A protein has these predicted regions:
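N-terminal ligand-binding/catalytic initiation module
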Residues: 1-38, 44-46, 56, 216, ...
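Glycine-rich Rossmann-fold phosphate-binding loop(s) that bind the pyrophosphate
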Residues: 65-66
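Rossmann-fold NAD(P) dinucleotide-binding segment
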Residues: 122-123, 134-149, 154, 160
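NAD(P)-binding Rossmann-fold cofactor-contacting core
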Residues: 79-106
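Adenosine-phosphate binding glycine-rich loop
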Residues: 162-273
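Short acidic low-complexity segments
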Residues: 109-123, 139
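Short helix-loop-beta connector
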Residues: 52-59, 82-83, 145-146
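N-terminal Rossmann-fold NAD(P) dinucleotide-binding loop
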Residues: 69-70
């Protein structure tokens, strides 16, 4: 990722995926992965909402209306069948207003651009944060209504009280434990290398301010091993750091579909037997 790419007329991130045969190691597909990554990143908050949002969630808020944010909202609207209102906050207000016009036309749901993070958060049933940059949007505890689902594919500033009084769900806690071990081995140690919402969560857990047993894996909710939403007033925060297996699964699906449709270019990497 290189923010200076924008000045060069390029995407901030230029992503690729290489799929290999698991038996031989031979490459089977080389994919441009910007759209692939955005789609899978957007899908994960929606999977969370399917299992964690209130059934009658009516107001959806999007903080950050870039490529990832739009992918998240597209997926969320697939599962939030009762959505009646969309609020969008973005630093680029003109772009947010144009996006809201597109949303209303495409989905038939009233969408409006709002002027602050607070306005987006207050009275919203599902809130997705997908901002970029060094400064994360600050979300105050009193802005979050009872029963809210806050999905975080990106970081947000949350108080310790917000974290301690909400149900915390993650994509894969074992992955966070592996990150923690890597951080301990880095110069400066664990605390010096923490960043983002995932680092904040790990710091709260390892400092004893949150009980690790109270952090729930989304997979356990889906499998029925742990409860997700148990009341309409329960506030839930779904934190995700992204897993490569998601790119792999979606990338292979795209590859299979491309083969069926005859899309793509065959590359001759070597002569047979050489």
């Amino acid at each position: 990722s290189n923010i200076a790419n924008r000045d060069r007329g390029l995407p901030r991130s230029i992503l690729t995926t290489l799929l290999n045969d698991p038996d031989t190691g031979a490459p089977i597909a080389f994919l441009s992965a910007n759209a692939l990554s955005a789609t899978r990143t957007g899908a994960i908050p929606a999977v969370g909402a399917k299992y964690l949002a209130k059934k009658e969630a009516k107001t959806v808020a999007l903080i950050g209306a870039g490529v990832i944010g739009r992918a998240c909202l597209n997926a969320l609207l697939v599962v939030l069948k009762e959505a009646e209102q969309i609020k969008v906050y973005d630093l680029n207000q003109e772009a947010a207003q144009e996006y809201c016009r597109e949303l209303t036309q495409e989905y038939g749901i009233p969408a409006r651009a709002v002027g602050s993070v607070e306005e987006a958060v207050r009275d919203s049933d599902v809130i997705n944060v997908a901002t970029a940059g060094a400064v994360s949007p600050q979300i105050e505890d009193e802005w979050l209504k009872d029963g809210v689902l806050l999905t975080l594919p990106a970081s947000a500033g949350l108080s310790e009280n917000t974290m301690q009084t909400s149900t915390i769900v993650v994509d894969n806690w074992k992955m966070y434990e592996a990150y923690a071990q890597e951080l301990r081995d880095m110069p400066g140690g664990f605390s010096a290398n923490l960043s983002g919402i995932c680092g904040y969560l790990m710091d709260l857990v390892y400092s004893g301010k949150l009980n690790q047993e109270d952090v729930i894996n989304l997979g356990d909710v889906i499998a029925g091993n742990r409860p997700g939403r148990v009341s309409q007033s329960q506030r839930i925060i779904f934190i995700m750091d992204g897993m490569a297996v998601e790119d792999l699964a979606w990338g292979y699906t795209v590859y299979e579909n491309a083969c069926k449709m005859g899309i793509g270019t065959k590359l001759n990497l070597w002569e047979r037997g050489k």
